[in-house]
Amino acid sequence: MLVQITALAFLAGIASAGVVVGGYGDGVGVGLGGLGGGLGGVGVGLGGVGVVGGGHGVVDLHTPAHYQFKYGVEDHRTGDRKQQAEVRVGDVVKGEYSLAEPDGTVRVVKYTADDHNGFNAVVSRVGHAVHPQVLVRKAVVPVATHGVVGVGGLGGLGGVGLGGVGLGGVGLGGGLGGVGLLGGRGGLDRGILGGHGGSELKFKRALI
């Protein structure tokens, strides 16, 4: 209260002296603001002391830790099934969790942990493993019959030539399974103009 009266008396003295210059007026305003801020700071400090003093009687740092939790997930769309539970009393933790494996079994893990023994876990499986059946597909190779110039092989490596039909096509100079136009060594077919072939002898006779 005394500070407020002093501040009012100070302002009245300045007003009667006729000091109206902007620079001086601003300086006085800043000074009074600083004085008010200082008083506010003292109030905040006292409040802080009260909070700290009240906190000493609430916190006990020697109380043993204690908690427990449990949760589970069961998703029928994705097949995800799992659960976990854990309890801690002081420095000893005990827990268990389980989850569904892809082979149809359930893995169960029971664990304990403390300062003396460390972490120990026992893992077990429940149920019988079901392995998915593997499908074996047999490859079917179509056999080419005949074409304009020659007969393609049963999957030869000849390039496409003058209108052959088949998987191998007609090779220009022979090949592994294609018909040779200029001879060469055909793997499965007869060369048209000579060379060695495997099976298509009647084709040359038909052309001659």
Curated annotation (Swiss-Prot):
<dbReference type="GO" id="GO:0031012">
    <property type="term" value="C:extracellular matrix"/>
</dbReference>
<feature type="repeat" description="2">
    <location>
        <begin position="171"/>
        <end position="180"/>
    </location>
</feature>
<protein>
    <recommendedName>
        <fullName>Adult-specific cuticular protein ACP-20</fullName>
    </recommendedName>
</protein>
<dbReference type="InterPro" id="IPR051217">
    <property type="entry name" value="Insect_Cuticle_Struc_Prot"/>
</dbReference>
<feature type="region of interest" description="2 X 10 AA repeats">
    <location>
        <begin position="34"/>
        <end position="180"/>
    </location>
</feature>
<dbReference type="GO" id="GO:0042302">
    <property type="term" value="F:structural constituent of cuticle"/>
</dbReference>
<feature type="domain" description="Chitin-binding type R&amp;R">
    <location>
        <begin position="64"/>
        <end position="135"/>
    </location>
</feature>
<dbReference type="GO" id="GO:0005615">
    <property type="term" value="C:extracellular space"/>
</dbReference>
<dbReference type="InterPro" id="IPR000618">
    <property type="entry name" value="Insect_cuticle"/>
</dbReference>
<dbReference type="InterPro" id="IPR031311">
    <property type="entry name" value="CHIT_BIND_RR_consensus"/>
</dbReference>
<keyword id="KW-0732">Signal</keyword>
<keyword id="KW-0193">Cuticle</keyword>
<feature type="repeat" description="1">
    <location>
        <begin position="34"/>
        <end position="43"/>
    </location>
</feature>
<dbReference type="Pfam" id="PF00379">
    <property type="entry name" value="Chitin_bind_4"/>
</dbReference>
<feature type="signal peptide">
    <location>
        <begin position="1"/>
        <end position="17"/>
    </location>
</feature>
<comment type="function">
    <text>Cuticular proteins play a significant role in determining the physical properties of cuticles.</text>
</comment>
<keyword id="KW-0677">Repeat</keyword>
